[in-house]
A protein has these predicted regions:
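A broadly structural signal marking compact, well-ordered functional cores
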Residues: 224-362
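Surface-exposed, charged secondary-structure patches
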Residues: 68-138, 247-313
């Protein structure tokens, strides 16, 4: 009888070790083990948290978060989560299927932690490749998290853990609650690069709309309808002179578009200034002197009727559209901010000066 009793006891103990709350697991131990696995193993549980951050950023900027950057950003978030120390204060039973587990921790402020790193990196941005630039920055930002983390005030958080016959679990809502409480300003490194490249993309899109007849990106930045932007260009930038004979207007506009399309410019990396949306940008320009060349040659000719002038003008425009002339390469520095944009159409504005340098008409 004693042997049977002993066997029964051993069987019960073994069943407890393997059963639902496996190996003597408790709600607080489950949460502790989960936190450790997130810190040390697969960071994929941070994916939903990152996706929410990405969604917010994609609404802010025209440039969209690169899919290929997600793995690097998840690893950065994992390193950030790893920098947070937790004290689990035990579990309280709510009912047969739920437990509350309280944590004490000091949240990591990612923006404060990476501020110096981002400020030092921003002037070194050398390409328009958002993924490449961010990948390099995240390596430096991860080192900052490991070496000099900046924390907020200590706080407490209570999570609700569910219990079933299969053991304990933490649903996605509770998991996001944990991540949101422990890591603040998670997209700060991304902001520091994307806002600069987005400003560069904006100025490039403005010039491309004017000179390349490419309005798609510009329309994204301004929220305007592409067809509306195109219509404005047709009635202003590419409009023929009023006195030009109707039989030549289409050829003139086509030639002018071709001349504009031959314009050469490259927008440099914006240098962030104090204040909201305030940048200094160097634009490398090789002036397209084709229009000037056409006008100069037109003035040297002799004509006996308005029709001859119109024909000569269009033929010269077509000539220099096919064989453009250029001046010496130069650099034009412009301010990009709300003030300069509001004055963009003024004759003495920096934007007007840039346009006149790209395609001199006088």
């Amino acid at each position: 009888m004693k042997k049977k009793h002993l066997c029964l006891v051993l069987t019960l103990i073994f069943a407890l070790l393997l059963g639902g709350c496996a190996s003597g697991e408790t709600a607080d131990k489950y949460v502790g083990d989960l936190i450790t696995s997130i810190k040390k193993e697969d960071p994929s549980s941070l994916s939903s948290f990152l996706e929410q951050g990405i969604s917010d950023e994609n609404e802010t900027y025209v440039l969209q978060f690169p899919d290929e950057l997600k793995d690097s950003y998840l690893k950065f978030l994992q390193a950030s989560f790893n920098a947070v120390e937790f004290e689990i204060n035990g579990a309280k039973k709510i009912d047969d299927e739920r437990y509350s587990v309280q944590h004490t921790f000091t949240p990591l402020d990612i923006e404060a932690t990476t501020k110096n790193t981002c400020e030092k990196y921003s002037p070194a941005i050398s390409s328009t490749d958002l993924n490449a630039e961010m990948t390099k920055l995240l390596e430096k930002a991860t080192e900052a998290v490991k070496s000099s983390p900046s924390y907020e005030n200590s706080t407490q958080l209570t999570l609700e853990v569910k219990k079933s016959k299969d053991g304990y679990s933490l649903d996605d809502e509770q998991l996001q609650k944990l991540f949101s409480a422990t890591m603040d300003n998670i997209m700060a490194p991304y902001d520091s690069v994307c806002e600069i490249l987005d400003a560069q993309d904006y100025l490039t899109s403005c010039l491309n709309a004017l000179f390349k007849n490419d309005v798609a990106e510009y329309a994204k930045h301004t929220g305007e309808d592409e067809s509306s932007v195109q219509s404005q260009l047709e009635s202003s930038m590419y409009a023929p002179p009023e006195e030009l004979s109707a039989s030549y207007t289409e050829r003139y506009s086509a030639a002018l578009k071709a001349i504009c399309n031959n314009c050469q410019y490259s927008v440099g990396t914006p240098k962030k200034q104090d204040g909201l949306f305030n940048y200094i940008i160097d634009v490398t320009v090789t002036p397209n002197t084709s229009f000037q060349s056409a006008m100069n040659e037109l003035e040297t000719g002799t004509y006996y009727s308005e029709e001859e002038v119109d024909r000569a003008l269009v033929e010269l425009m077509e000539k220099y559209a096919a064989a453009p002339t250029y001046g010496a390469q130069t650099t034009v520095t412009v301010s990009l901010n709300f003030k300069t944009l509001s004055a963009a159409g003024a004759e003495d504005s920096e934007i007007t000066s840039l346009i006149d340098t790209i395609l001199p008409v006088e």
